[in-house]
Amino acid sequence: PTIYDVDLTYITPRGSWYAASWKGDPCKSGGVAANIGIHFIDMLHWIFGPVEKVVLHHSSPECSAGFLQLKGARVRYFLSVNAAHRPSPNDNPMSPYRHLVINGEEFDFTNGFTDLHTLSYERILAGRGFAVEDTACAVHTLDMLQKSAAVGLTGDYHPLLRNLQG
Protein backbone atom coordinates (compact mmCIF):
# COMPACT_ATOMS: atom_id res chain seq x y z
CA PRO A 1 0.00 0.00 0.00
CA THR A 2 1.11 3.55 -0.76
CA ILE A 3 2.10 5.77 2.15
CA TYR A 4 1.86 9.48 1.31
CA ASP A 5 4.06 12.24 2.71
CA VAL A 6 1.90 15.21 3.68
CA ASP A 7 2.70 18.69 4.98
CA LEU A 8 -0.30 20.62 6.28
CA THR A 9 0.08 24.31 7.08
CA TYR A 10 -2.87 26.30 8.39
CA ILE A 11 -2.30 29.80 9.69
CA THR A 12 -5.45 31.77 10.40
CA PRO A 13 -4.47 35.03 12.10
CA ARG A 14 -6.71 36.29 14.87
CA GLY A 15 -6.89 39.71 16.43
CA SER A 16 -6.26 40.56 20.08
CA TRP A 17 -9.82 39.43 20.86
CA TYR A 18 -8.72 35.82 20.42
CA ALA A 19 -6.40 35.64 23.43
CA ALA A 20 -8.95 37.48 25.58
CA SER A 21 -11.81 35.15 24.60
CA TRP A 22 -12.55 31.55 25.58
CA LYS A 23 -10.91 30.46 22.31
CA GLY A 24 -7.53 31.70 23.55
CA ASP A 25 -7.77 29.65 26.74
CA PRO A 26 -6.64 26.05 26.05
CA CYS A 27 -8.56 24.84 29.12
CA LYS A 28 -11.81 26.11 27.59
CA SER A 29 -11.22 25.64 23.85
CA GLY A 30 -8.96 22.60 23.79
CA GLY A 31 -6.15 24.67 22.31
CA VAL A 32 -5.18 25.53 18.75
CA ALA A 33 -5.28 21.91 17.55
CA ALA A 34 -8.90 21.61 18.69
CA ASN A 35 -10.00 25.10 17.76
CA ILE A 36 -8.61 25.39 14.23
CA GLY A 37 -7.09 21.98 13.55
CA ILE A 38 -9.84 19.46 14.26
CA HIS A 39 -11.43 19.92 10.82
CA PHE A 40 -8.14 19.14 9.09
CA ILE A 41 -7.41 16.20 11.36
CA ASP A 42 -10.86 14.88 10.47
CA MET A 43 -10.26 15.42 6.74
CA LEU A 44 -6.91 13.61 6.91
CA HIS A 45 -8.56 10.62 8.60
CA TRP A 46 -11.24 10.42 5.92
CA ILE A 47 -8.57 10.38 3.20
CA PHE A 48 -5.70 8.45 4.80
CA GLY A 49 -7.24 6.29 7.50
CA PRO A 50 -6.86 5.95 11.26
CA VAL A 51 -4.02 7.24 13.40
CA GLU A 52 -1.17 4.92 14.33
CA LYS A 53 1.16 7.37 16.08
CA VAL A 54 1.20 11.01 17.19
CA VAL A 55 4.16 13.21 18.07
CA LEU A 56 3.68 16.71 19.42
CA HIS A 57 6.66 18.92 18.56
CA HIS A 58 5.37 22.29 19.76
CA SER A 59 2.38 23.54 21.71
CA SER A 60 1.58 27.08 22.79
CA PRO A 61 -1.66 29.08 23.13
CA GLU A 62 -1.17 30.31 19.54
CA CYS A 63 0.51 27.41 17.74
CA SER A 64 0.57 23.62 17.55
CA ALA A 65 2.92 21.55 15.40
CA GLY A 66 3.45 17.83 15.22
CA PHE A 67 3.54 14.58 13.30
CA LEU A 68 0.74 12.11 12.64
CA GLN A 69 1.36 8.63 11.32
CA LEU A 70 -1.88 7.57 9.69
CA LYS A 71 -2.54 4.24 8.00
CA GLY A 72 -1.87 5.79 4.59
CA ALA A 73 0.19 8.91 5.32
CA ARG A 74 2.97 10.55 7.27
CA VAL A 75 1.68 14.02 8.15
CA ARG A 76 3.70 16.98 9.41
CA TYR A 77 1.33 19.73 10.53
CA PHE A 78 1.69 23.36 11.59
CA LEU A 79 -1.35 25.22 12.98
CA SER A 80 -1.22 28.83 14.12
CA VAL A 81 -3.33 31.89 14.87
CA ASN A 82 -0.30 34.23 14.71
CA ALA A 83 0.13 36.27 11.49
CA ALA A 84 3.90 36.46 12.13
CA HIS A 85 4.11 32.70 11.51
CA ARG A 86 3.16 33.10 7.82
CA PRO A 87 5.93 31.72 5.58
CA SER A 88 5.78 34.70 3.20
CA PRO A 89 4.40 38.25 3.22
CA ASN A 90 0.84 38.77 2.06
CA ASP A 91 -1.16 41.83 1.02
CA ASN A 92 -3.50 41.15 3.92
CA PRO A 93 -1.59 39.66 6.87
CA MET A 94 -4.90 38.82 8.57
CA SER A 95 -6.06 36.56 5.74
CA PRO A 96 -5.77 32.79 6.29
CA TYR A 97 -2.96 30.71 4.82
CA ARG A 98 -3.99 27.14 4.02
CA HIS A 99 -1.43 24.99 2.26
CA LEU A 100 -1.17 21.26 1.68
CA VAL A 101 1.71 19.36 0.05
CA ILE A 102 1.14 15.70 -0.80
CA ASN A 103 4.16 13.80 -2.15
CA GLY A 104 5.65 17.09 -3.34
CA GLU A 105 2.49 18.31 -5.10
CA GLU A 106 1.25 21.62 -3.71
CA PHE A 107 -2.38 22.48 -3.05
CA ASP A 108 -3.28 25.99 -1.96
CA PHE A 109 -6.75 25.95 -0.48
CA THR A 110 -6.67 29.43 1.02
CA ASN A 111 -9.91 30.39 -0.75
CA GLY A 112 -13.31 28.73 -0.79
CA PHE A 113 -14.05 28.51 2.93
CA THR A 114 -16.20 31.62 3.26
CA ASP A 115 -19.57 29.93 3.88
CA LEU A 116 -18.37 26.59 5.18
CA HIS A 117 -19.86 26.97 8.66
CA THR A 118 -23.14 28.32 7.27
CA LEU A 119 -23.50 25.30 4.95
CA SER A 120 -22.67 22.92 7.78
CA TYR A 121 -25.23 24.52 10.12
CA GLU A 122 -27.91 24.40 7.41
CA ARG A 123 -27.30 20.68 6.92
CA ILE A 124 -27.42 20.03 10.67
CA LEU A 125 -30.74 21.88 10.96
CA ALA A 126 -32.06 19.85 8.01
CA GLY A 127 -31.19 16.60 9.83
CA ARG A 128 -28.20 15.80 7.62
CA GLY A 129 -25.41 16.48 10.10
CA PHE A 130 -22.59 14.16 11.09
CA ALA A 131 -22.90 11.51 13.79
CA VAL A 132 -20.47 11.14 16.69
CA GLU A 133 -19.17 7.96 15.05
CA ASP A 134 -18.17 10.01 11.99
CA THR A 135 -15.80 12.15 14.03
CA ALA A 136 -14.57 9.69 16.67
CA CYS A 137 -11.25 9.05 14.93
CA ALA A 138 -10.39 12.77 14.80
CA VAL A 139 -11.45 13.32 18.41
CA HIS A 140 -9.31 10.35 19.50
CA THR A 141 -6.29 11.80 17.66
CA LEU A 142 -6.85 15.20 19.24
CA ASP A 143 -7.06 13.56 22.67
CA MET A 144 -3.75 11.79 22.05
CA LEU A 145 -2.11 15.10 21.05
CA GLN A 146 -3.50 16.92 24.09
CA LYS A 147 -2.07 14.24 26.39
CA SER A 148 1.37 14.41 24.73
CA ALA A 149 4.36 16.40 25.92
CA ALA A 150 6.04 18.54 23.26
CA VAL A 151 9.39 17.08 22.18
CA GLY A 152 10.80 20.05 20.23
CA LEU A 153 12.82 19.74 17.04
CA THR A 154 13.25 15.98 16.99
CA GLY A 155 12.22 13.43 14.41
CA ASP A 156 10.13 14.40 11.40
CA TYR A 157 8.91 17.93 12.17
CA HIS A 158 7.24 20.61 10.01
CA PRO A 159 9.79 22.97 8.39
CA LEU A 160 8.08 26.14 9.71
CA LEU A 161 8.77 24.97 13.25
CA ARG A 162 12.43 25.94 12.78
CA ASN A 163 11.32 29.60 12.66
CA LEU A 164 9.78 29.31 16.12
CA GLN A 165 12.53 27.31 17.76
CA GLY A 166 15.63 28.90 16.34
PLM feature spans:
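A short beta-turn/loop motif at secondary-structure boundaries
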Residues: 57-61
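C-terminal helix-rich "cap/oligomerization" subdomain common to oxidoreductases
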Residues: 122-166
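Predominantly a Rossmann-like dinucleotide-binding segment in NAD(P)-dependent oxidoreductases
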Residues: 1-52
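An anion-binding loop in the catalytic cleft
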Residues: 98-104, 117-126, 136-137
